[in-house]
UniProtKB/Swiss-Prot annotation:
This is Fork head domain-containing protein FD5. Keywords: Developmental protein, DNA-binding, Nucleus, Transcription, Transcription regulation. GO terms for molecular function: DNA-binding transcription factor activity, RNA polymerase II-specific; RNA polymerase II cis-regulatory region sequence-specific DNA binding. InterPro entries: Fork_head_dom (IPR001766), FOX_domain-containing (IPR050211), TF_fork_head_CS_1 (IPR018122), TF_fork_head_CS_2 (IPR030456), WH-like_DNA-bd_sf (IPR036388), WH_DNA-bd_sf (IPR036390). It comes from Drosophila melanogaster (Fruit fly).
Length: 271
């Protein structure tokens, strides 16, 4: 984590970049995300230099927020009062400052467009269910397990979330399988083809079979082989995007079950 702040600059300009000032405000917030107005307030409260000429430096800071991948825009929950979105640090950017010093930053943090789209989609879904803080904690915990030496200092302030794979509810299988009656054979003539079928009772010709019998298994097999297996596809998707599956520990919350489906054919929304 960043070192304690030095508050003795007085009216002098502190030696921090706008990226460092913004990261400083976000890191010191309880939920690690703030609206733009709160970021401004934190900077002015800590550094008197920024209490004057506010329009100039606020425009520059807002420009840095929009054009740096280390910051993520989180939509505001519709149930909360106020306007404007929240801002937070990308989960992989919490350690972008060398040795925890906000004065020294590593090379510019960049994120691939696909990863950015997926992250925006997840944060939008988390904002609708008020789970943004849990999402950030889970991302930090996964990073620490992947590289404990590098991300050990981040775990100090990240709650240890229990990760559990996505589990689908097994379908309810029927106890019996009913075989449909075969249509009676008839001569290949116009009169025969246009004639109605002979009357029969609703259950006549239906042969009940026990589930699991050879005849029932033969009826359950599709007439062709599918080009892929859905479970295998889901396993491969989880391999390349492990954090795309939500944690099962929040699955019992009613509002949490209203999130968009995990798999869809349309493009990922960009916020």
């Amino acid at each position: 984590m960043p070192r304690p702040l030095k508050m003795s600059y007085g009216d002098q300009k502190p030696p921090y970049s706008y990226i460092s000032l913004t990261a400083m405000a976000i890191i010191h917030s309880p939920q690690r995300l703030l609206p733009l107005s709160e970021i401004y307030r934190f900077i002015m409260d800590q550094f008197p230099f920024y209490r004057k000429n506010t329009q100039k430096w606020q425009n520059s800071l807002r420009h840095n927020l929009s054009f740096n991948d280390c910051f993520i825009k989180v939509p505001r929950n519709v149930t909360k009062a106020g306007k404007g979105s929240y801002w937070t640090l990308h989960p992989m950017a919490f350690d972008m400052f060398e040795n925890g010093s906000l004065l020294r930053r590593r090379k510019r943090f960049r994120v691939k467009q696909l990863e950015k789209d997926i992250s925006n989609w997840k944060l939008a879904a988390a904002a609708n269910t008020e789970m943004v803080t849990h999402y950030l904690d889970d991302q930090l915990t996964q990073m620490a397990f992947a590289d404990p030496a590098r991300h050990g200092h981040v775990l100090a302030n990240a709650s240890a979330a229990q990760m559990s794979p996505y589990k689908a509810t097994p379908p309810i299988l029927p106890t019996t399988v009913t075989q449909l009656p075969a249509r009676p054979k008839r001569a290949f003539t116009i009169e025969s083809l246009m004639a109605p079928d002979p009357a029969s009772t609703p259950n006549e010709g239906l042969v009940p079979m026990e589930y699991g019998s050879p005849d029932a298994v033969a009826l359950e097999k599709p007439p062709f082989n599918l080009p892929f297996n859905f479970n295998e596809l889901a396993a491969q998707y989880q391999l390349y995007f492990p954090s795309f599956f939500y944690n099962g520990q929040y699955g019992n919350i009613p509002c949490y079950q209203k999130t968009p489906p995990l798999f869809h054919n349309g493009p990922l929304p960009v916020f």
